[in-house]
Amino acid sequence: MNASGEYDSTSGLAQWANARYAPETSAECSSLATPAHTDESLTILTTLPEARAAVNTAASAAQRMISIYTPDLEPELYDQTAFLEIIKRFVLSRSFSKVRVLLVDPARVLRDSNRFVAMGRRLSSYIDIRYVAGHAPQRASAYLIADDRAIVYRLRADTWDGIADLNNHAVARLHLNEFDNVWNASAPDHALRVARRG
């Protein structure tokens, strides 16, 4: 507001408040720090087909690494032919590529047949699956991060509601740092390795 009590849309505070929702149009706004992504890269997810499409799109965009945090390798997402083909192409076309998976509750993976685990057995130098260590912080969320740019994130793993942002380095990096901390605290579990061979 200016001295006469009217709303002043050119003030720095007003520009900051509106920066998230309005495109930058003036030179004064250019000095504000803005994320390196566009609203077009953000998608709201509410259904399983939307979640599948987002996971497939993000994984297809990966160049170096895919990191997955999941309760049980959610077969509705990760045991699907389209996703498995994307992962296979990803790891076989790049000698330096890596897929890392953190499992919160591996009981279902050990009990049920899972094609992703079978692929991990065949391509063990590219696909690494670990259990979340008991002392590591566990989240109710589930997510996939491609490199350090694209993320498909669901606040609760028991629902398909979430977001997909294919070009948000800051948010992807934040969750990747969290993933790395849990990854480093979680050693590969021998039970899954035995299950892979059996």
Predicted region positions:
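Primarily the HKD phosphodiesterase
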Residues: 58-123
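HKD (HxKxxxxD) catalytic microenvironment of the phospholipase D
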Residues: 128-172
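Signature of lipid phosphatidyltransferase scaffolds
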Residues: 2-32, 155-198
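Amphipathic coiled-coil/heptad-repeat helices and related helical stalk/stem segments
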Residues: 51-52, 83, 175
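Interdomain hinge/linker segments and adjacent boundary elements that couple functional modules
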Residues: 2-74
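Long, hydrophobic, amphipathic alpha-helical segments used as structural scaffolds
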Residues: 70, 98, 103, 127, ...
